Amino acid sequence: MVPGAWHSLLFTTSSASEKEENRSQRMQLGEQLLNSSTPNLPHTFYPLTGDPSSAVHSPSLEFSVGHKGQQHKKYSSGSSRGLQLDSPREAGSSSTMLSETGEGFSVAKTLPDNVRKGSPSAEEELNTAVPTSAPRYLDGSLQAASERYYLQPQGQQLQQTTTELGSPCSIFPYAPPQHSAVYPAGGAARYPPYGSMLPPAGFSPPVCPSRPQYSSGYQYSQAPGTMYSPYPPAGTGSGLSALGLPGGGAGVRAQVFLCNRPLWLKFHRHQTEMIITKQGRRMFPFLSFNITGLNPTAHYNVFVEVVLADPNHWRFQGGKWVTCGKADNNMQGNKVYVHPESPNTGAHWMRQEISFGKLKLTNNKGANNNSTQMIVLQSLHKYQPRLHIVEVSEDGVEDLNDSAKNQTFTFPENQFIAVTAYQNTDITQLKIDHNPFAKGFRDNYDSMYTASESDRLTPSPADSPRSHQIVPGTRYSVQPFFQDQFVNNLPPARYYSGERTVPQANGLLSPQTNEEVANVPPQRWFVTPVQQAAANKLDMGAYETDYSSGSLLTYGIKSLPIQTSHPMAYYPDAAFASMAGWGSRGSTYQRKMTTSLPWSSRSSPSGFSEDLLPKDKVKEEMSSSWVETPPSIKSLDSNDSGVYTGACKRRRLSPSTSSNENSPPIKCEDIGTEDYKDATKGLGYYSFYSSS
């Protein structure tokens, strides 16, 4: 060993003795409390104590007295700065030994077992606390240091210390080596930003030096539009491409929302079907979109393209759709529908929802490129509508090859199967319930119609258990007029109209409950146009009766509650209950009124209804004559497509043969004559209900 090394060893022994002398003084400062936390602290928090128990955690643990010479040689040769321990100047001067931060470790690692081992920071702090050791530290900068925590060294010594302690900076993510502060500010703080908590693929091996690279992790996680991104354009793999910025320039992606998406989802659960006809049929639900993210000043064309959704041919079997072969890809025809308002500015398209309610689907191959822009489809094929937004150049020419100007949006819930008649009854019912025009059931209930073409809107309730829902009660504005106070006494007869009939078993005009519908044979209800009632008022002046115009409202509303009271009771019961029904003036009056008034046999005008029966008798007769009517009589009524309630009255007044030729014979030819008496009317009434 060189002589300089022996001098260094002697000096180290002397330094250790000085530490033992000042141990009691340091314990008064509370250093013993800091000693207790030593085993759990990394190198950045080594306490400044002289307790020998902390020596096991010192970086000089691997050096012993028996090998102090070898270790000193090893450490001297490995030092980057090359300790010249053979110099007499360095043997007597501590300034040279501690002139560099790293040299203090080489001396502390050769201590004997009976001497306390500690980090260089302990000696540095000891010099500050005890003035007697001041000759050992000639560097003023180190003497002025009063921090109780060890400041990270610079250069190669930091890497060696980090390796010996098992990379503790993975627990305490301090700043890179260029920082010298204990709590550096900025992105490399002790508490890193949220991005470093969730790196894309876990923490990388260089945790401490490379920690700042995670400061911007998940930089798009809080960006607007990415948490709940809309459907991206077709052909793009990221939702960010659909994020539009209003007022952006070229290449900015638009953002499209399906306005009636909940309605589409209802149909999509049962596999949506769309009717195609030769003349063209509009879609329901129709396509309606909201568009954002367009350039307000640029011009765009917006159009819908219908393409095959899959290469299969479909059929409805066993209550579900199944594939049966390959689709015909050679189908020629128009597949594009351009919105009528195209081209237009981005501000126009973003102002309100874009509806394609006039888009029509057809199976007519000859309807190519016509003015109606009908889309030609094949039956029993599944199709997918796609929305295209194409930016138009200044000269009005579209550049379909420029992907930055051509954007396509696809919504899977818009898929549908083209059919010529609805296959799934659930889809039919959804169309009826939600389509205000109720056109869906026309193609599905053709086999149920038994009447003429004018009566095609009246399917038989016996054939269709859902026919009572064909016209929802909330669809007509006349519903508020028919409250319980008006219809509770209304017999379940018909409302007549020469135009259209609507089946109602428990719908708008029916006073029956659901239980009664199940027990009473079905019958038809007629909705009378308002215009017809207005014309009826003009005809009332020619008759002998003294009616007021207020008594002739639509559907005979005034007469319904008046039936409950009859102060003039000199008319026999049979006169009111008979099918002629309107007293001695019945023949003349009925011949004039039957062609214009839609009254049923129970909806008498007020002039006669007040003179006929007491209230209790009216209720009794109505319950006996209408609720307990034999099925044959009501089947006669249900088979009639426009005659009046009294079959005998219809036969007497109709110049042609009635449609109820198959009905039971009714002996009522004499009813309604001028000289027919009240008793005869009663016999006619009872014979009418007993003949069945």
Curated annotation (Swiss-Prot):
Residues 596-609, 654-665 have a biased composition (Low complexity). Residues 35-135, 595-614, 621-673 are annotated as: Disordered. It is found in: Nucleus. Keywords: Activator, Developmental protein, Differentiation, DNA-binding, Gastrulation, Nucleus, Repeat, Transcription, Transcription regulation. Residues 578-692 are annotated as: Required for transcription activation. SMART domains: TBOX (SM00425). Residues 263-443 bind DNA. GO terms for cellular component: chromatin; nucleus. Its main location: nucleus. Induction: By activin and derriere. One of its GO terms (biological process) is mesoderm formation. One of its GO terms (molecular function) is DNA-binding transcription factor activity, RNA polymerase II-specific. Gene3D superfamilies: Transcription factor, T-box (2.60.40.820). Functions as a transcriptional activator playing a crucial role during development. Functions in gastrulation, regulating mesoderm differentiation. Activates wnt8, t/bra, chrd and mix-A/mix.1 expression. This is Eomesodermin. It comes from Xenopus laevis.
